[in-house]
Amino acid sequence: MASVWKRLQRVGKHASKFQFVASYQELMVECTKKWQPDKLVVVWTRRSRRKSSKAHSWQPGIKNPYRGVVVWPVPENIEITVTLFKDPHAEEFEDKEWTFVIENESPSGRRKALATSSINMKQYASPMPTQTDVKLKFKPLSKKVVSATLQFSLSCIFLREGKATDEDMQSLASLMSMKQADIGNLDDFEEDNEDDDENRVNQEEKAAKITEIVNQLNALSSLDEDQDDCIKQANVPSAKSASSSEELINTLNFLDEAQKDLATVNTNPFDEPDVTELNPFGDPDSEEPITETTSPKKPEESFYNNSCNPFKGVQTPQYLNPFDEPETFVMIKDSPPQSTRRKNLRPVDMSKYLYADSSKSEEELDESNPFYEPKPTSPNNLVNTVQEGETERRVKRRAPAPPAPLAPPAPPAPPALTPKTGVNENTVVSAGKDLSTSPKPSPIPSPVLGQKPNASQSLLAWCREVTKNYRGVKITNFTTSWRNGLSFCAILHHFRPDLIDYKSLNPQDIKENNKKAYDGFASIGISRLLEPSDMVLLAIPDKLTVMTYLYQIRAHFSGQELNVVQIEENSSKSTYKVGNYETDTNSSVDQEKFYAELSDLKREPEPHQPARGAVDLLSQDDSVFVTDSGVGESESEHQTPDDHLSPSTASPYYRRTKSDTEPQKSQQSSARTSGSDDPGLSSSTDSAQALASLGKKRLKAENLELSDLCVSDKKKDVSPLSAYEQKLQTVHASSDMEQGKMEKSRSLECRLDGELAITKPNVSSPSKLGYNRDTDFTKKPCASLRQIESDPDADKSTLNHADHPNKAVQHRMLSRQEELKERARVLLEQARRDAAFKVGSKHGGSAAPALCSRQLNDQQDEERRRQLRERARQLIAEARCGVKMSELPSYGEMAAEKLKERSKASGDENDNIEIDTNEEIPEGFVVGGGDELTNIESDLDNPEQNSKVVDLRLKKLLEAQPQVANLLPSAAQKAVTEASEQGEKSGVEDLRTERLQKATERFRNPVVFNKDSTVRKTQLQSFSQYVENRPEMKRQRSIQEDTKRGTEEKAEITETQRKPSEDEKGFKDTSQYVVGELAALENEQKQIDTRAALVEKRLRYLMDTGRNTEEEEAMMQEWFMLVNKKNALIRRMNQLSLLEKEHDLERRYELLNRELRAMLAIEDWQKTEAQKRREQLLLDELVALVDKRDALVRDLDAQEKQAEEEDEHLERTLEQNKGKMAKKEEKCALQ
């Protein structure tokens, strides 16, 4: 298979297919004196593709007998087909080299390469048919060859063009270039590939066989054979863990005690629910324990229901061995008379047959005493042994009720720790009862390597979960299970049933099924890595390609896609955010739906875990989220549907909300090191760690509230009020100082802002990706409230939450709207105080301003108050409708401080711009680039050098918070006006004023991604809005200039001739940030490509050998991260290409308008025929341009509608699940 990364690199590129024909004319080869070639062959090759000429004899020359030639009397034509790729904004195609090789063919038929030479096919590609004569010099590969040349003519014919991912643009030969094996990896296949009925029969046979073995422990030899079968069954999915063998011994040794307790079997409260827990896909209506045990719905459940399974759930201690319970049922029904005989049988120590180092002591497993019985004090060991397997399961299952009795999973808990953690028989019983009755829709857990989730196994489990109810779909691996395309179609139909009709699919039509699935995924923005021909031509599809494609699908539907926030020179310092623009621009789930569980929560009793310490809970949580903090994104089961939802109908947004809480906890666990640097943060960090660990309910509202509030409290410890007073004093003291001192105060303000804003990056994941998790996860409604609720008593309320979580949650829910309204009132009051304070500071200054200046300031104050009132109205409206917009956090306490600073800063344009931008930067955004944002002043001093940098930084600001575009114009206008009032007429200041005017024009109607409060999508501002306003502004300026110059026709023509150059300059400035960001993205892409090539090579080697599973897992995690980053870059470049298209259309539209206005200004009777024809041509071109513009607007509108439809579908799904969750939660109760 061709490189997966190569295919990923081609996403979003244009492709053109060419046919090249080489007509060989003459070949010259000069060799040494001691050797001459037999027959020569010219081979044209690339990778595994070879095009050979016929063998020709070498004829020595007359002048130089060592230099011979091969002449083709009739040119021999060799034909190849080449696909060339290029970026949408690039001028030329990417390099693609084909190699000519001269080979010597011996009489025996063996070939040896003599010389080689390569040509770059892009140099000969042309849209028009061309023919080029080429004389190629070769590089000798053998000491026998001195030199060689080849003369041929190369013809090029353009065939077709399209997207790089189109099926007809894929090279069929490249599919086979890796020489894929015809035999699949047997490790990918599971033992049971039959239908459910056959599986049921096999399970019954296995159960009967194990029962027969247990009943007939007469001969050690027969026991050994059956024991080997049990070992195989237990070790196939569990990576040959020693614990499975150990539990198997317990099964045999503790059987006598289990037989003694048979009287309590029928009253066992865990029997049926526990089987249901182990088989979340089984029939819930089934009552028979045997049917539950022997009727799995998935192929791998033969392992999970096996008696030797070391990961099976916690059972009652009455059996001493919790793993023989189902077989005990079978034994009672099949052979009750054998029970008396079994009491006389002796347990056998098999540790020496299974493994060398037994964890049992010699006293417990004494081989010399065949009548030795296990001590009855073993429940402690049993509980801890069970806890290991159970914890590994529940780490990924995350049952809704907190499993108090579970010990921390990182180190295996010794028996001495059992009393500490409160684990006894009663707690095991109660917890098992509660957990077993809880719904368990999550996928079956994957094997665990060092407490880290296995990325490939979790991905496989997710695929099984999503496709479990679809006919004809049986997923056991990442190769053959996907070949017929039904599995891909099932996933697509599960999330987007409107895109595919699953019932109409034919399982035999491999190509059509795959084509429908790939086209459907591509239509929703998932990079296309597979083609239908891949599955048709290859009996065993490439495993890594399929895994990568499925990972992209899961990331898309679970909201784990990355998006670019900030690009740095070093890829490791670049910042990405989790979530995509289409769905995360505003709140993804409204209050009513998000808190739907609260009604069920009230019915539940408060979790009772008095014997459990916060440190124990924290250690367990820390081990759960090791991968999240190490990789920077969830690659585990946390991306699967949450525990409260039915897996087949769980909304992706609910999955997103669930997975979004994981980084919160990973941040809190990592905050112990970063928070220790600041003594002011340490106390709240500790409380955050403790509070974030209260309970194991992933989606319970009190957990979300506690974790979010604690994270925000770490920030609030910096005392926003005192910081605000400091800033007020700073601004007041500097109001009557000169400009240099004001810059010092601004640097102080920037440092204060940095102290506040840098708190979040300190607790971000150690991967240095800088995900702004708290600000980016706007899908959680409570996330937007974090920064708004900055009242001094927030810490107290947080501590109260620790004692009364349910009560606090109810209180927070009731007071949420009142708090929003109160915040709006505070903003209004602050605006009034700002205006009064500014007027007072102006009067108290060293010089009284002029009357016009005061009037201007009053107007500015009025405008500022109007903006704040508008913002307050939005806050109140949002509070009433229960929808929190993602821009609310930026107007919290700190934002109000910055508004005040901005209202007091006078006479310096940079101060206004700087505060505006800082105001809109989300918290945690200053990741290595915060200092850049405050250097616009110095950049303006060197406009020629730094104009590109300024534009690029302004663009970054707009991307960080698009609302900044709405405030920049007024800020820039105010700055320009105040600068002119101060009377600074120097050339530098004039230049600043001119550049700021251009910035005002650019951002008055910005081409940025606006936010819509009702639709979560990327909304590029429509072209008509952008174009129709801007030419109008220039038109007014043009009319004024024409009035000044008079109405003479000559002046009019001069004006129109002079204008285009200014327009071109303006256009250049406007598009500069696009060019700058494209360059930054390309640099980032090169670094990622370099690393990905190495990772893919190493990963393929590890997957083939299977020797180092830990390194393979680490490489897999890194590979998935790189794929996610690559897709983020692809999406960003697509958005920039749309901006570029709009800009090109706008430029042509403007220039046509200019020329057409000049023509229309001439009276008809004065026009010549040439002018009339020219006018008609201009009108026609303008109409065509408008049509193109409308087409672009329609495309953008279609994208917006598609996003709306997707959101509506997800909301409907969430609404359907609401009732199901309520019913399931009613069944949960703690005792």
From Swiss-Prot:
Residues 378-388, 664-689 have a biased composition (Polar residues). InterPro entries: bMERB_dom, CH_dom, CH_dom_sf, F-actin_Monoox_Mical, NT-C2. One of its GO terms (biological process) is endocytosis. Residues 453-558 form the Calponin-homology (CH) domain. Residues 1059-1212 form the bMERB domain. It holds the Pfam family bMERB_dom. Residues 185-219, 812-882, 1032-1100, 1136-1230 form a coiled coil. Residues 635-645, 793-806, 1209-1231 have a biased composition (Basic and acidic residues). Keywords: Coiled coil, Cytoplasm, Endocytosis, Endosome, Lipoprotein, Membrane, Phosphoprotein, Prenylation, Protein transport, Transport. Prenylated. Farnelysation (predominant) and geranylgeranylation has been observed in vitro. The modification Phosphothreonine is found at T328. GO terms for cellular component: cytosol; endosome; nucleoplasm; plasma membrane. The modification Phosphoserine is found at residues 171, 174, 177, 222, 302, 307, 335, 436, 438, 442, 446, 646, 719, 765, 784, 1061. Residues 8-158 form the C2 NT-type domain. Interacts with EHD1. Interacts with EHD2. Interacts with RAB8A, RAB10, RAB13 and RAB15 (in their GTP-bound forms); at least in case of RAB8A may bind 2 molecules of RAB8A simultaneously through a high and a low affinity binding site, respectively. May play a role in actin reorganization. Links clathrin-mediated endocytosis to the actin cytoskeleton. May act as Rab effector protein and play a role in vesicle trafficking. Required for perinuclear sorting and insulin-regulated recycling of SLC2A4/GLUT4 in adipocytes. This is EH domain-binding protein 1. The lineage of its organism: Eukaryota, Metazoa, Chordata, Craniata, Vertebrata.
